[in-house]
């Protein structure tokens, strides 16, 4: 590193501390990331004459080394701040790091509830209206994989009991018909007997004790309550049941297109987040399905 480059680095450190008033931890990280980047530059290129193509090459090298998106973002922040500093100082006319971006951080997969825990959750007992209503709601979420907004918007006419179907108005006002399982139909029927005794303002399928359409927040709160009462190890909410529906369907059928239609996803890529099945399940499917994978029976 040239003496001139070291001088500017010292000035940059002072600028970060004094003018930008960044924490000592952040300044230390930025200086480390600049040093890391400079060591990967081609011979004859330093932090003062680096070009965009050089930073792109360094970014690729760091990515190949296995740096996480979070670490790459920190490195990019450092070289962008360095470029802005040199720009302000009149050393360069364009920031070579401007516009560079790190690979997107992978979104953590939502955790589904296993089948046994779902069964335990849905085994709530009681014949009072609220319990019957809540059981019908949870059965329908798990049976058909509805979104919270879709379920809350259901009317009495939305469910076709003879056909075991529900007509749903999804995102973008797109209508779809989704199958409803026997347990959900039975739970809804039990709830409707109680609903008849409530003076309702509209035709909402799920209503409060005062006859008003049940709000999103109320549905979320009731499901959280039942998760706690049934002593589940994780928090229960509508999307958790939707995710569990999708995961369990794919584990049983592996029909991605069918699950896409059931969930109302416009793009298949959205449905694919549910395909991260555990290896034990995949290995079992492979052993059962592949003609040359079946293990010999013990003799």
From Swiss-Prot:
It comes from Shewanella sp. (strain MR-7). Keywords: Cell cycle, Cell division, Chromosome partition, Cytoplasm, DNA integration, DNA recombination, DNA-binding. One of its GO terms (biological process) is cell division. The active site is at residues 147, 171, 239, 242, 265, 274. This is Tyrosine recombinase XerC. One of its GO terms (cellular component) is cytoplasm. The keyword ATP-binding does not apply. It holds the Pfam family Phage_int_SAM_1. Forms a cyclic heterotetrameric complex composed of two molecules of XerC and two molecules of XerD. The lineage of its organism: Bacteria, Pseudomonadati, Pseudomonadota, Gammaproteobacteria, Alteromonadales.
């Amino acid at each position: 590193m040239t003496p001139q480059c070291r001088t500017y680095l010292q000035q940059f450190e002072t600028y970060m501390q004094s003018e930008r008033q960044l924490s000592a931890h952040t300044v230390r990280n930025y200086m480390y990331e600049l040093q890391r980047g400079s060591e990967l530059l081609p011979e004859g290129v330093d932090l003062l004459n680096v070009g965009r193509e050089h930073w792109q090459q360094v970014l690729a090298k760091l990515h190949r080394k296995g740096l996480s998106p979070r670490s790459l973002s920190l490195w990019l922040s450092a070289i962008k701040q360095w470029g802005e500093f040199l720009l302000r100082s009149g050393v360069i006319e364009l920031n070579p790091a401007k516009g560079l971006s790190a690979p997107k951080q992978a979104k953590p997969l939502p955790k589904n509830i296993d089948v046994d825990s779902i069964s335990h959750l849905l085994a709530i007992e009681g014949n009072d209206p609220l319990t019957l209503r809540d059981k019908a709601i949870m059965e329908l979420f798990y049976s058909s994989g509805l979104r919270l907004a879709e379920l809350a918007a259901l009317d009495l006419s939305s469910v076709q009991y003879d056909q075991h179907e529900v007509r749903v108005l999804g995102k973008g006002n797109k209508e779809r018909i989704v199958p409803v399982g026997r347990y959900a139909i039975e739970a809804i029927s039990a709830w409707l007997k109680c609903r008849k005794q409530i003076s309702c303002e509209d035709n909402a399928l799920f209503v409060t004790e005062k006859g008003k359409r049940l709000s999103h927040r109320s549905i979320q709160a009731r499901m959280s309550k039942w998760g706690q009462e049934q002593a589940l190890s994780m928090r229960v909410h509508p999307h958790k049941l939707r995710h569990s529906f999708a995961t369990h369907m794919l584990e049983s059928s592996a029909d991605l297109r069918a699950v896409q239609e059931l969930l109302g996803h416009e793009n298949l890529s959205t449905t694919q987040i549910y395909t991260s099945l555990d290896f034990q399940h995949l290995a079992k499917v492979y052993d059962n399905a592949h003609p040359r994978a079946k293990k010999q029976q013990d003799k």
